[in-house]
Regions:
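Alpha/beta enzyme core
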Residues: 7, 33, 47-68, 84-90, ...
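Catalytic alpha/beta core domains of metabolic enzymes, predominantly
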Residues: 216-351
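Short, small-residue-enriched loops and turns at beta-alpha junctions
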Residues: 40, 44, 74-78, 132-134, ...
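N-terminal capping/small domains of soluble enzymes
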Residues: 1-107, 371, 376-379, 383, ...
Length: 551
């Protein structure tokens, strides 16, 4: 690509080395979660949500378990203001949920904000102003001192109006464009704001460190966060919050590393909706913790429902590959993957049902409301014996011999390849029946009689081939062997009986049985058949005839 020289790094490393966070292995407890779907997410929609959609979305967030929910920028529009008043006046805010409202550090906007939250049981008032080099120089054309004064004046007005307004308020400050701000200067501004608020153990302040635009790799942000955490005043009474965006695709990594670096709180959205490439996806963050055995304190056990409400309200589509939530994230089309999953599921069932270590599946799909049959093993032209066999076994109770699974896998692959489509379980089952079960052309058996004689079995078989019926007598070590010998004798066939397997299809005295028979042809290849009948002897004979017809 051309013109690479016009770009330069726009981030700043802390003045001292801040890498203690690298000593931690994983995030071991859930942060305070704050959904910003109804503000940051909503403002990024082509068609913002209506009042009714916002109320429905708010109820979804409460259902998931969010205890802090940003509900709007009251001064931005009448819809935003009305929505906030609706929540308050209709008592839609649960006792254990705190709403959050956003305001710029401008007097008339701050005053409008406090009007909107009057009477709220409790609310976080989030004030911000931009502090980055680019914003100072290009947008506001102000010095560091002037930018700091904007922050302090805004913080002062928040404190004054909180004392004058009905309600219980907590304060939050963001140095917007934190990642493009010199860390020392961001610290100076935040500490000046904290000096105004003087947070206490009973009324902590929130300092939010937004990745307004991603400029760096995640480890840089983590170092910036660690620097702030170690140098903020009143640290024991300050909640350090993160608000990552996803411009470089690192929103989740920024958040996880930022938590390792000492942050206490995350602001984000469901499925990463937000300006440009979006905010950090809280679903992914929470489920990452869950997959490591850490309680995220959010409930995504009915992910299909969450996706449905999100898509209806936001008008956005959850991507099919979106981690943990997409329609295809548990799907295995590859034959080797399917085989490993099927074996892993059997191993878990037999060895350790209490733990989840199944290959290729980072979590149990049923933990998020998905199921194995429809969501995991999916059959197309890339699939193989493992997936086809797993579907036939788990959904239809057919436990095929290994080599027969292979033959059935090739049959399914051929159909999918020819039709250029995925095969659904019922199509696979029907393919099995039409290919391997009770096939009576060109050979069929009309009648069989057995007699035990001289330690062996003698049989009299009446069979039909191309409309001609003959009766043949033969002996064998068992019934199936005797019938095999009779058919060889009648039609001068050459084959060897190499595989026989049977099992009940249902657990009852009147259930049908299925038998599988594999025969080896003179060229060494195998042909397969299955027979289904309440009489296992008849089922095995039908399986043999089908295998012969499949030669």
């Amino acid at each position: 690509m051309k013109n690479v020289t016009k770009y330069k790094r726009q981030y700043f490393m802390p003045p001292v080395k801040c890498m203690k966070w690298t000593e931690k292995e994983y995030v071991d407890k859930a942060p305070i979660w704050c959904s910003v779907d109804l503000r940051d997410g909503n403002q990024a929609l082509v068609i913002p949500m209506s009042l009714e959609q916002k109320v429905e979305f708010f109820k979804l967030l409460v259902e998931i378990g969010f205890k802090e929910i940003e509900v709007g920028f009251p001064a931005a529009s009448e819809t935003e203001y009305t929505f906030i008043r609706t929540l308050i006046e209709q008592n839609l805010i649960p006792d254990d949920v705190t709403i959050q409202v956003l305001t710029q550090a401008r007097e008339h906007i701050i005053r409008k904000t406090f009007e909107a939250v009057k009477g709220a049981p409790k609310a976080i008032v989030h004030v911000y102003n931009s502090t980055s080099v680019a914003q100072r120089e290009q947008v506001f054309k102000k010095s560091k001192e002037e930018i700091l004064k904007i922050a302090v004046d805004g913080a002062t007005l928040l404190k004054e109006l909180a004392d004058q307004t009905e309600g219980n308020f907590q304060f939050e400050y963001s140095p917007e464009s934190f990642t493009g701000t010199e860390p020392e200067y961001a610290l100076e501004v935040c500490n000046a704001v904290l000096d105004v608020w003087k947070p206490t153990a009973d009324n902590k302040a929130i300092i939010n460190l937004p990745v307004t635009v991603q400029h760096s790799m995640p480890h840089v942000y983590a170092s910036q966060v660690e620097y702030m955490c170690e140098n903020l005043k009143y640290r024991e009474n300050v909640i350090v919050s993160l608000h990552p965006h996803n411009d470089r695709g690192c929103g989740v990594a920024d958040s996880e590393m930022g938590l390792l670096a000492g942050a206490d709180r995350i602001e984000g959205t469901l499925f990463g909706n937000g300006e440009r490439t979006g905010n950090v996806d809280i679903v992914t963050l929470a489920m990452n913790m869950f997959s490591q055995g850490v309680d995220s304190e959010l409930d995504f056990s009915n992910m299909p429902h969450v996706c449905e409400v999100y898509e209806e309200c936001a008008g956005m589509k959850v991507d099919e590959r979106s981690p943990y939530s997409g329609a295809l994230v548990f799907a295995a089309f590859s034959g080797s993957h399917q085989d490993a999953i099927a074996k892993g599921m059997h191993w878990r069932e037999e060895k350790d049902p209490s733990r989840w270590t199944v290959p290729y599946l980072p979590i149990d799909p049923t933990d998020v409301g998905r199921n194995y049959d429809a969501d995991v093993i999916r059959i197309n032209s890339q699939s193989g014996k493992g997936g086809v066999g797993y579907i036939l076994e788990t959904k239809y109770g057919l436990n095929l011999p290994p080599k027969m699974r292979e033959a059935m896998g090739y049959a399914a692959k051929a159909v999918s390849d020819h039709s250029h489509k995925e095969l659904h379980p019922d199509e696979i089952f029907n393919l099995f029946k039409s290919t391997f079960e009770n096939i009576v052309e060109p050979y069929s058996i009309n009648e069989v009689h057995f007699q035990q004689k001289d330690g062996g079995i003698t049989t009299q078989v009446t069979s039909t081939f191309n409309g001609k019926t003959i009766t043949t007598e033969a002996t064998g070590n068992g019934r199936l062997d005797a019938v095999s010998n009779a058919l060889r004798k009648a039609y001068e066939m050459k084959f060897t009986l190499v595989t026989y397997q049977e099992h009940a299809l249902e657990k009852s005295t009147s259930s049908k049985a299925i038998a599988y028979v594999g025969i080896q042809k003179p060229d060494g290849t195998l042909a397969w058949g299955a027979g289904v009948n309440p009489d296992i002897i008849r089922a095995s004979i039908d399986a043999l005839v089908t295998a012969i017809n499949n030669r």
